[in-house]
Structures are given as C-alpha cells and as structure tokens.
C-alpha cells in the first residue's frame, strides 16, 4: 500500500507534492517506501492549507468534518468521506460480531462519547448506525456524556434488548457503572458490554469493572485504538485480550516482549487498510488512504508490532495456549510519548498546565516546573495528578494546593476544548502535589526535565 498510496497522493494532493519538493524528494526516483519522508502534524498538517491536503485540493469533496484539540486548544479539522469510514466500520463490525455476538442478539448501543463535532462521538455514532443498516438487530441511543441521560436511556430501554453496549472512554464508562450501582441499577440484568477507547487501562481495572457490571472480562470489554487523524486503527479481540491477561500475570515475559515495565494496549489491525511501521526509537507510523491521505504518518505513539504467529508462539513457549482468533498482526501501544497524557480521552498538554502555573497568585511561590500523569485511586478511578515544584524556601500548604489545582483546572477548561467537553466536571480539578525545589524524585538537578510521566 505505501508505494501505491504514495504515487496517488503525489498525483492528486497539491500539498503532498509540495511537501516532497520542500524535502528535496523527486517522486519519480522513489522506489523504496523507506525513502518516503515521514509526515507529521507539525511538518504537514500545520504547514499546508486544509483544502490543499485534500484530494484535488477540494475540501468540498469531504462529506463531513470532525474536530480534535491541539496543544494550543485550537481545534484541528479532519475532513472525512463515507469511503474513508469503511475501514473504521470494519473494526466496529469485528468487535460487535465476533466479540459481542450482536449479529444474533438484539442490542441497545449507548454512545457515551461527547457529541457535537468531536471525533469520538461522530465516528462511533456513524459506525454503530452502519451496523444497524447492515442488518444487525441493533438500536442506537446517543445521550453523549450526560450521566443522568445515559442511565435514563438504559433504565427505560435496556430491558427490551438481549444486551446493552456502552461505548465511551474507560474512566467515564466506569463512572457510569458505579453511578448506576449507587442508584440501584442491576447491571447484570442488562448483559452489558463495553466498547472503550482513548486510554490504556490495566487488567486489574478490566477485572474490577467486569465484576461490577456482571460482564465477562475477555469477551465483553473491548478497547479500540484510534486517532483523530484516521479513526480506529485496531481493536482488541478475545485473542488479544487473553494474551494481554496472560502477560499481566507474567510481568517478566511482558517486559521482555515490550521492552518496558508498563503493560501496553494490545490490539490487532488490518494491514490492507492501516499499514503500521515501527520507527527507530520505538514509536509508530502508519499509512492510510482517505480524503486527506496519510503516507508514513508519524503519530509518535510509543509502541511496536508483532506478527501474529510470533506472539502466539512465544505464549506457547511460556506454557500458555492463547486459542484461536483473527489472522491479523498485532500492534501494541503505550500511548503518547513525552508530550501528553490522556485523561477521559482528552489529550492534556503541558503547555496548558504551564499557563495555570503562570498566574500571579501561583507563580510567586512555584518555579514553573511540574510533572503531569494519570493515576488510579483505591477504587480504580482515574485521577489527573500534577506534581508542582515549589520555589526555594516556599512552603507546601493546603491552601496553595487548592489554589494551584483551581488555576490549572480553569486554564485547562479555557485552553483545551477536548478537556472541557470530554472530562466530567467533577473530575476536572487535578490532584496537586507540592514538592520542594530540586526534589530528587521529580525535579533532579542537572537532568533534562520531563513534564509527563506514564
């Protein structure tokens, strides 16, 4: 696909031809995909006008646009056509047909992603309606991320179907499950299934949520891996979940396979529509056709690839039989590299937090350095944690923690449109820790500072 897509983009996309010219690439001399320069949001999408990145230089060839938020909070526009979404619909069909058996069970699908032009809600609503149009006995409800409306829909309609599928960001859907339990919802009676996206979650989290919902953790809880740029790129299958659960129980094998103590999301993908590459340094790129073609697009997600048989054979050598599953390769993903953390599906950028710490009532007793990360509390709920470095001699007080937390919350909501729309209001205030200057754990002197941590 890369060479065919490359030649087509050269011939039909004005911005891509200019992109190659600026990189001193003669497209007629390119015979090896490795010679094609990597495309990024910074060197391509933010450089060339939107219409010139579309085929024929025509934005009006798109059927719809979706929005995602960049580091400045200014939305990025992603044009789509119906043809672009066929590859995404195939991934949803694999989840609903193979995992949830929704082709043979009447299903109420409840879209819990934020609605509007935001990419998650648009894609999900379109994909699930497509399945209904294909003959699945499936009805879609789209309350968005309105907790009361979600529970009202489930309560009024859920009992009329064989099963209910909740689609949303993992921490938000867990909040729906927990709120329902508090209000007396008998989740097992609805035979719930969960289709999740936007976060890496632990197998302990999956087990906890499955137990509260009365769901099977292997077949009933599925993670989708996607980006605003190209939609769903891959999805968990019962095979990938079984392997991941085994690796969670064998951290020694996991660390050897993935080169990291963290357990990544593990999904399968179709190389005919989304062809991944592992770039030197342990990040991912992919090629995908669409209204805005992406040729060796470097998304900077940390991760890598495994051929199907290689990963299965390794499991067998360790005494674990993973069983059957799709004949598709695996991609594993840790998430964004050094620059962001994902929280309720929103990319939280250090630049946004910096502004909160630059307000006069905070800047006078902080250095401006911080570390942002997501943690799980004792109830496996996701928490946005910000460790802030105090100015030399400044004291850590409860009042200062509260002031910093509120300042960060206010600026995140103002600057980052994803954060404002995706994160529930009662989860938007971060947990702030105040550490002394040059704290050895978070702010060691003489070391290049990292503003995010996994």
Please place each PLM-identified region on the residue numbering.
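Ligand-binding cleft/hinge of the Venus flytrap
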Residues: 129-133
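Active-site glycine/GP-rich loop and adjacent strand/helix microenvironment
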Residues: 4-5, 134-454
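Conserved coil-to-alpha-helix start sites within the AMP-binding
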Residues: 113-128
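Nucleotide 5′-phosphate-binding alpha/beta core
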Residues: 1-107, 111, 160, 383-454
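Alpha-helix N-cap/loop-to-helix initiation residues
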Residues: 85, 117-118, 147, 202
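Short, conserved acidic/polar surface loops in the N-terminal third of protein domains
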Residues: 77-81, 88-89, 120-124, 177-179
């Amino acid at each position: 696909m890369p060479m065919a897509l490359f030649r087509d983009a050269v011939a039909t996309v004005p911005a891509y031809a200019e992109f190659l010219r600026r990189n001193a690439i003669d497209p007629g001399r390119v015979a090896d995909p490795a010679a094609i320069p990597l495309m990024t949001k910074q060197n391509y999408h933010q450089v060339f006008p939107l219409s010139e990145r579309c085929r024929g230089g025509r934005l009006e060839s798109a059927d719809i646009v979706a929005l995602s938020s960049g580091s400045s909070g200014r939305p990025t526009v992603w044009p789509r056509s119906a043809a672009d979404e066929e590859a995404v619909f195939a991934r949803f069909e694999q989840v609903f047909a193979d995992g949830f058996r929704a082709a043979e069970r009447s299903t109420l699908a409840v879209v819990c992603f934020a609605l509007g032009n935001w990419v998650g809600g648009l894609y999900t609503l379109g994909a699930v309606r497509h399945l209904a149009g294909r003959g699945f006995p499936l009805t879609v409800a789209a309350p968005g991320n309105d907790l009361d409306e979600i529970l009202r829909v489930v309560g009024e309609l859920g009992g009329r179907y064989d099963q209910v599928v909740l689609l949303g960001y993992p921490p938000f859907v867990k909040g729906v499950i927990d709120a329902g339990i508090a209000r007396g919802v008998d989740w097992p009676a609805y035979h719930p299934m969960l289709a999740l996206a936007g976060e890496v979650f632990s197998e302990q989290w999956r087990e906890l949520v499955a137990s509260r919902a009365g769901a099977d953790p292997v077949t009933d809880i599925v993670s989708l891996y996607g980006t605003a740029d190209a939609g769903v790129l891959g999805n968990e299958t019962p095979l990938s979940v079984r392997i991941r659960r085994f690796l969670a129980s064998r951290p020694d094998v996991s660390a050897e396979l993935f080169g990291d103590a963290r357990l990544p999301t593990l999904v399968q993908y179709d190389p005919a529509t989304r062809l991944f590459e592992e770039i030197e340094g342990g990040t991912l790129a992919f090629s995908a056709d669409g209204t805005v073609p992406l040729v060796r697009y470097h998304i900077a997600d940390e991760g890598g690839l495994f051929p199907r048989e290689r990963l299965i054979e390794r499991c067998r050598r360790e005494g674990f039989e993973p069983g059957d599953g799709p004949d598709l390769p695996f991609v594993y993903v840790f998430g964004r590299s050094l620059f962001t953390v994902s929280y309720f599906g929103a990319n939280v950028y250090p630049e946004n937090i910096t502004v909160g710490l630059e307000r006069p009532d905070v800047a006078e007793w902080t250095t401006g350095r911080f570390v942002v990360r997501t943690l799980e509390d004792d109830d496996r709920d996701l928490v946005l944690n910000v460790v802030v470095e105090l100015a030399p001699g400044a004291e850590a007080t409860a009042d200062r923690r509260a002031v910093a937390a509120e300042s960060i919350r206010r600026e995140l909501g103002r600057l980052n449109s994803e954060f404002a729309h995706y994160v529930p209001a009662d989860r938007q205030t971060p947990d702030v820790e105040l550490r002394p200057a040059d704290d050895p754990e978070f702010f060691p002197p003489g070391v290049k500072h990292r503003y995010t941590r996994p």
